[in-house]
């Protein structure tokens, strides 16, 4: 792995980081795959889709090439539960706010997330990378 980064951390910190790096991403994508698998008009969905959906679908499909046993091991990380519960709470919060017409709460949630993540990431650069990635693999 010539591009690999090696970091020395204790086992607890490792499990916490891997819960986000692999656990949360695998959990989200396995569930997304299950939803896509139930779409009886997937070709229409794909035809209507844009950059975000295409990128997510590729990631989801790629994860499904891994063995179910490996995915199960990744999802068995005990540290994942805390992040999954936070994800579930936030999904509920956002859906409730949208259904109750509380756009200001949703917008504030998005702005707050954007502000915090922007401290470490150039979001415009990330969007350009996404566009470049999708454009390079169009079939």
Predicted regions and their residues:
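An accessory alpha-helical subdomain
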Residues: 8-138
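Short beta-strand and adjoining strand-loop segment in the mid-core
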Residues: 1-6
């Amino acid at each position: 792995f010539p591009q690999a980064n090696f970091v020395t951390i204790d086992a607890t910190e490792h499990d916490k980081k891997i819960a986000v790096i692999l656990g949360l991403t695998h959990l989200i994508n396995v569930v997304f795959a299950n939803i896509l698998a139930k779409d009886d008009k997937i070709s229409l969905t794909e035809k209507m889709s844009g950059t975000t959906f295409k990128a997510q679908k590729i990631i989801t499909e790629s994860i499904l090439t891994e063995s179910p046993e490996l995915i199960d091991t990744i999802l068995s990380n005990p540290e994942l539960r805390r992040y999954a519960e936070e994800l579930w709470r936030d999904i509920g919060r956002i859906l409730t706010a949208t259904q109750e017409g509380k756009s200001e709460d949703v917008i504030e949630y998005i702005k707050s997330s954007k502000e915090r993540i922007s401290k470490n990431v150039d979001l415009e650069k990330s969007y350009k990378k996404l566009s470049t990635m999708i454009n390079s693999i169009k079939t």
